[in-house]
Amino acid sequence: MILLKIIHIIFVMIFLSIFFPKSLYASTSLIRKDHIIQKNLENFDDQSAYALGVSLGNYINHSFREQKRLGVILDKNSLLSGIRDSLSGKTILSDQEISMELIKLEKKLKYFEDIVLKKEAHNNKIQGDLYIKKMLKKKDARHTSSGLVFFIKKKGSGKFLHDSDVITVHYKGSLINGNEFDNSYKRGQPLSFSLDSVIPGWIEGLKYIKKGGLIKLVIPPKLAYGETGVPGIPGNSTLIFEIELIDIQSK
């Protein structure tokens, strides 16, 4: 949660104030005066403090960009003032007021996050359906009643798969916009697992090839990660996998 990230940053900055008090107050002084003072980083402590400060600043900027994406814009100067006042022990809000404001902010972020995610998921579903229709027009396209679209690049040989089989595969997965979210080839190592432990689109699609086979799957969200998605894969995403079936081991 974005709010928790900000709270984490505040705690880290308090930690820095204990070990690098001069560096921290020098930074807040620059903020108050709104001008730049060049400083030579002559020793390890100065360089470490500066590096941590830049890292924390980048972290805060990232959090603020994510909030802006949700339509929530917080004032950076007010955030920094709150940190400075906390370090000095002179805050303009009581502990109870601070707790109430944080709860309100968390609810606000959650509300707008839900709206944005639902909107993105709705758009992903529309774009995914259009992409599948486009793929179905290709002459070598095949599809199933469940909505899976596949292209057999190489059939392979031997026996077909069963749900309980342990398979070894190389694969790469991407979204319909071309963004790649996984690639075993780049890791330089194939993956082994039981077929019944993966998404339905894989279970259904891989049964059309044998050992040594190669297949391309276009998987609608209901056969992948559904409306909610997973980290790196937004809700209602249609997925594209190119899978090489290297080995099959029956249990």
Swiss-Prot record:
Residue stretches making up the PPIase FKBP-type domain: 164-251
UniProt keyword annotation of Isomerase present: yes
Coiled-coil region list: none
Entry keyword set: Isomerase, Rotamase
UniProt keyword annotation of Isomerase present: yes
Xref: Gene3D superfamilies: 3.10.50.40, Peptidyl-prolyl cis-trans isomerase, FKBP-type, N-terminal domain
Single GO BP term: protein folding
Organism: Buchnera aphidicola subsp. Baizongia pistaciae (strain Bp)
PROSITE patterns in alphabetical order: FKBP_PPIASE
Pfam families in the record: FKBP_C, FKBP_N
EC numbers, comma separated: 5.2.1.8
Stated name of the protein: FKBP-type peptidyl-prolyl cis-trans isomerase FkpA
Database matches in SUPFAM superfamilies: FKBP-like (SSF54534)
Function: PPIases accelerate the folding of proteins. It catalyzes the cis-trans isomerization of proline imidic peptide bonds in oligopeptides.
GO molecular function: peptidyl-prolyl cis-trans isomerase activity
Family, as annotated: Belongs to the FKBP-type PPIase family.
Catalysed conversion reaction: [protein]-peptidylproline (omega=180) = [protein]-peptidylproline (omega=0)
